[in-house]
Amino acid sequence: MTNNIFKYFNIKELEKFGKFYKVKKEYEIPKKLESKLILVTSINPTPEGEGKTTTLIGINDCLNYFGKESIACLRQPSMGPYFGIKGGATGSGKCEIQNPEKVNCGFTNDFYAIEAANNLIMSVIENEIYFNTDLEIDPQKIIWKRCIDINDRSLRDINYQVSKNTKINSSFSITAASNLMALFCLAKSKSDFKKRIENTLVAFSKSNKAIYVKDLNIIDSIMLILDDALKPNLVFSQDNNPIIMHGGPFANIAHGCNSVIALSCGLNKAEYVLTEAGFGSELGAEKFINILCRETNLVPNLVVLTITLKAIKYHGVNNSNNTSPLTDEKEKIDIGFNNVIHHFNLLKNLNLNVCIVINKFSDDNKNELDYLFNKSSELTKTVISTMWQDGASKNKSLFETIIESVQEPKPINWTYDLKDNAVNKINDLSTKVYNGATITYSDLATAKLKDNENWIQDYYVCGAKTPYSPSIKNEYMDTNKHDIHVEDIEINHAVKFIIPIFSKTFLMPGLPKVPNAKKIKINFDKFKYE
C-alpha cells in the first residue's frame, strides 16, 4: 500500500529526509478557519497505559478510512524517557507509526539541533565572561541553562569554572523542558522564531542591565543550526496516513504540545486536524488551552478524553482514601472513576466540548467494560475503540461518534486572567485545576517572584508537577482538596512562562534502577526491534 502523502501535499512542498519527509513550505493559521481541530487528552497515566497516542493515530486512520480528510499532529519522542522508564511514544498495535525505532531514537535530528543552538547561547555567554567583554555579564545572574536529551540526574546541580577566578553554579534541563524547545513549539514561523529568540532575556550585567540574545551577535548561527529543524516532519501510520511530527516539550515540566508550525500546516491541508497534549488533562490539555490557544486564537471543536478499564481500576485500587484493599471489581471502577469525573469537569469548566473514548485492551472483561461504558455515557457521549486490535475497518462507531461530537467552539473560560499578578495566577491554577485548598510558597519561590515582578506581568503559568495524580503528590490518587506548596519558580523569558515547581519535580529527570536502555534489543541485520 502506498502512503497518502500526495493526497495532501505537492511534491514541491516536500524534501526527503531519510525514511521521512520535511515540509519546506511555511503556512499561517488560516484567518477563516474551516478545519475542525480535535484535541486528544487523557486521565492521569498509570503503569497500565492509557493509549493516548494510539487513540489519536486510530481516530486519524478511522477518519481517513471512512472518507474524511484528516491529518494528525504529534510531538517527537524524547530519548530521555525512551531510554529511561516510559519507553517510546509512537503508538502500538495497528496504531503504530512506521519506523518506530528511528522515530524514537533521534528521528530527523531536530532535538540535536535544538540542543546545540540552546547550548551555543550558554557557551557564548560564558565566553563573554571569560574575555571580560563590554557586556560585563554577571556570572551570578545568568538566566539561560544548558540542555541535553538524556535523563541524567547528576546534571541537576553543577559547579564549574568559567575563568581562572570565576566559578558558576548551574544545571541542565532535559531538552524537552528547555527554554528553546518551548519557543520552537510556540513560534508561528521561522521569522517569528528569529524575532522572539533575538529578544529573549538571558542574563544581567554587573550594573543590572538586561542582556538579550541579540546582544551576543549569534542570531545567524542559531538560525543556521535550526534551519532544517524548523521544518515540520512527516511520518506515516500503519494505514499510511500522514502524521506531522514536530517539537516535543514535556507536559509535566513544559507546555506539552507539538509545534504551532505543525498545526498551521495541518490546518491548511485537511478537513480534520488531530493533536495531542501530554499526560492528563490537568497538564497538557490545560496548557494547550491557557497557553497555546491564547497564542494562536485557536479553540478545539472537540476534546477526546481517553480512558481505559485497566487505568481506572488502578486509580481505584491506589486511592489514598481506601481503608482496606479492594476486592470487588466494580468497586475498583467506581472509585477509580472519580479520576475520570475530575478530568471531565476540568475540561467542561474551560467551556470545552468533550467526548470519551474507552481504549479497549484485548483482555478486558466484557461485563466490566460494559459497566464502565454505562458510567461514562452518563457523563457524555462515549465510544469503545478497538483500533489497537482491529484497525479502522471495524471501528465505524468510533468514526461516527467523533463526527457527531464535533461542534462549533464556544468562548473559552480561562483558568486565570493573564493580566493578573503572578501569585493570583498561580493560585487560580492550583485551586481550579490541581484541587488546591491552601497555597503556600517557599522563601525561595517568593524571592524569585519578587525579583522578577517587573518582567513577568503578562506571563503565562506553566506548572511543573507530577503527572500521576490530579494533585501535586505522586501517591495521591484521589481528587480531594489538599494543601499545595510551591517549592521554586523558574522563568522562561523566551515564551513568557512563569514555571511554579511543585513538590519534588525536576527539570532534569533521572534514570530508574533498571532503565529501558538495558531492555532494548535490536536485530542489526534488519535494524528492527526484536
From Swiss-Prot:
Gene Ontology MF term list: ATP binding; formate-tetrahydrofolate ligase activity
Question: Which SUPFAM superfamilies does the record associate with it?
Answer: P-loop containing nucleoside triphosphate hydrolases
Q: From its record, what is one biological process in GO terms?
A: tetrahydrofolate interconversion
Q: Which keywords accompany this UniProt record? A: ATP-binding, Ligase, Nucleotide-binding, One-carbon metabolism
| Cited Pfam families | FTHFS
Tell me if Phosphoprotein is a UniProt keyword of this record: no
Q: Which reaction does it catalyse?
A: (6S)-5,6,7,8-tetrahydrofolate + formate + ATP = (6R)-10-formyltetrahydrofolate + ADP + phosphate
| Binding annotation for ATP | T46, P47, E48, G49, E50, G51, K52, T53
Pathway(s) the chain acts in = One-carbon metabolism; tetrahydrofolate interconversion
Keyword ATP-binding included in the entry's annotation: yes
Instruction: Name the top EC class.
Output: ligase
EC assignment: 6.3.4.3
HAMAP family hit by this protein: FTHFS (MF_01543)
Q: Which family does it belong to?
A: Belongs to the formate--tetrahydrofolate ligase family.
Question: What protein is this chain from?
Answer: Formate--tetrahydrofolate ligase
Q: Which gene encodes it?
A: fhs
